[in-house]
Amino acid sequence: MSGIDTIWEKVLANIKHRLAPASYDTWFKETKIKVLNNHQVVIQAPTSFISEWLQTNYIDFIQEAFIEEIGEKLNIKVISSEDELMNNEKEAPVRKTQQTSQELLPNQLNTDNTFDTFVIGSGNRFSHAASLAVAEAPAKAYNPLFIYGGVGLGKTHLMHAIGHYVMEHKENAKVVYISSEKFMNEFINSIKDNKTEEFRSKYRNVDVLLIDDIQFLAGKESTQEEFFHTFNELHQNHKQIVISSDRAPKEIPTLEERLRTRFEWGLITDVTPPDLETRIAILRKKSEEENIDIPNEAMLYIATQIQSNIRELEGALTRVSAYSKLVNRELNSDLVAEALKDIIATSKPKKVTIKDIQLAVGEYYNVRLEDFSAKKRTKSIAFPRQIAMYLARELTDFSLPKIGEEFGGRDHTTVIHAHEKIKNQLETDESLKNELKNIEKDITS
């Protein structure tokens, strides 16, 4: 045991002596010390929920324990294992492509995200089958594989599962997982540092490229150009490409047509929110993994209240378990309702404002907020502005003059014209229907 570990053992013993057993087990039992130098200490908690709770409620308590044990006041920071994972990914240096997948991926793939831990339901069955087929026969089954769906529904889990499977079954396979935002940032840095050849070598000399959240490249013309050539080289060399997005290729605005076409070469599959049976199965599996003793009626309550995505569902279970230990009460439906009252209250439909609409439409069509009020009439701004006016009439109770006022003081007749134009276009334009469906989802989520 290292010196700092010994100090932390003493601090924990001090804390344990002063806390109720249930509180200690809930908040401190799984913590570790990561850094202790220059009057600073970094403590690692197993989850973001616990790290935030410690940072908010126990910093002074921890400070007192350190003072008693080492006689020194320290600057204390609490992080989670997830924080460290993200930081490692950001800081990981560019490595030579000759490395094996086992060397490439320790900080890129979540070890929990495998096919074995994925809960299959009606909303993801096809995507799971396609992902497994790709993992078993890279570049032979479906290339590219394009998985789309909302936040927290399992897209990234499936991509990580593909990566793990290939690493396990294909010796020395080169696998890279990256978000499209990080791809763009690395590309920009490679230009700045005059290292574009290194960048290209890193992403074009792999057996499997897993790229997450491709919709982030919308409007990023230079990065789209670079990814276009990366895609072509990998595809021509029979290397597997797996892409995820929050929407289908044809619904990503300002995506170059040549990229859109290539994304449609292989298989496009979607994941949808889990049904009740799947949500219960997810909770049951998670409770078994975490050794959480939860009765069926309490599990059913969580599953009926948290319907949006898997991430929130699992987070709710963790919160309920921690709350039960903290208050030292049996885990039942009443306690679940008490523990989740804030989450359930915030999950109810919110009142939509015109600014909410402008922000969502602006993000979708890459338009700045101030452009909705500007006098500009270019098509790239005028059309999104009309969309926003249409949605303002459909989703809010504001009067026509009030809507016009929020769009730079425009006359109410302009709002009527915009509403009628979009309404008529929706009758024949399926693509526009899908775009509005995605925007409305963003507004109300």
From Swiss-Prot:
Residues 325-445 are annotated as: Domain IV, binds dsDNA. GO terms for biological process: DNA replication initiation; regulation of DNA replication. Pfam families: Bac_DnaA (PF00308), Bac_DnaA_C (PF08299), DnaA_N (PF11638). Residues 72-107 are annotated as: Domain II. SMART domains: AAA, Bac_DnaA_C. GO terms for molecular function: ATP binding; ATP hydrolysis activity; DNA replication origin binding; lipid binding. Transmembrane segments: none annotated. ATP binds at G152, G154, K155, T156. Plays an essential role in the initiation and regulation of chromosomal replication. ATP-DnaA binds to the origin of replication (oriC) to initiate formation of the DNA replication initiation complex once per cell cycle. Binds the DnaA box (a 9 base pair repeat at the origin) and separates the double-stranded (ds)DNA. Forms a right-handed helical filament on oriC DNA; dsDNA binds to the exterior of the filament while single-stranded (ss)DNA is stabiized in the filament's interior. Oligomerizes as a right-handed, spiral filament on DNA at oriC. This is Chromosomal replication initiator protein DnaA.
